[in-house]
Curated annotation (Swiss-Prot):
It comes from Rickettsia akari (strain Hartford). This is Inner membrane-spanning protein YciB. The lineage of its organism: Bacteria, Pseudomonadati, Pseudomonadota, Alphaproteobacteria, Rickettsiales. It is found in: Cell inner membrane. Coiled coil: none annotated. InterPro entries: YciB.
Length: 180
């Protein structure tokens, strides 16, 4: 539950900051503060923070700080693109190297044949590259308000759809002792 809150909390803070706190600068500030609080709580309670959370928070702190200092919202808008490309590269390289990173993230939930982890790595890489392109299209062609709404109400459903589309692969290739 804490991990879910640490992922969703900053997004909710960003949305609330934008629509109720006076725009993208305040939204960025609220998201930065919430992210630092969430990652700190994760560390205090779980005594660990995932590498992806560290990467995500670091990119957020850099892009968010530049946004606040410069007053230019472009930097916070390219943060998702940067993260999606980084994650896409991580999953692509782990597939190429036959050491699927996604296996370590999901192995406690589902156990799969090794070749299925590789396939899932490539699919996840493609998803992240696709999301990078979509983010670029939205922030470059639409208003701040549209981008914020997309960030909150578009990315989550798209991600959910991607996950659902992976279920046939997971169910077909799961090992007998898998939890799903």
């Amino acid at each position: 539950m804490l991990k879910l809150l640490s992922e969703i909390g900053p997004v909710i803070a960003f949305f609330a900051g934008f629509f109720y706190g006076g725009g993208i600068q305040n939204a960025t500030l609220y998201m930065l503060i919430t992210s630092v609080i969430c990652i700190t709580l994760c560390y205090i309670i779980d005594k660990k923070v995932s590498k992806l959370s560290i990467i995500s928070t670091t990119v957020l702190l850099v892009s968010g700080s530049i946004t606040l200092i410069s007053g230019d919202s472009m930097y916070i808008k390219i943060k998702p693109t940067i993260l999606y490309v980084i994650f896409g590269i991580i999953f692509l390289m782990s597939g190429i190297r036959k050491t699927p990173f996604i296996k370590y993230a999901l192995e406690s939930i589902v156990r799969l044949k090794e070749e299925s982890w590789i396939t899932l790595s490539y699919r996840t890489a493609a998803f992240f590259f696709f999301m990078a392109v979509v983010n670029e299209i939205v922030w470059r062609n639409f208003s701040d308000e549209t981008w914020v709404k997309f960030k909150v109400f578009g990315i989550i459903p798209i991600t959910f759809i991607f996950i659902v589309l992976q279920l046939p692969l997971l169910l077909k290739n799961k090992l007998p002792d898998s939890k799903i």
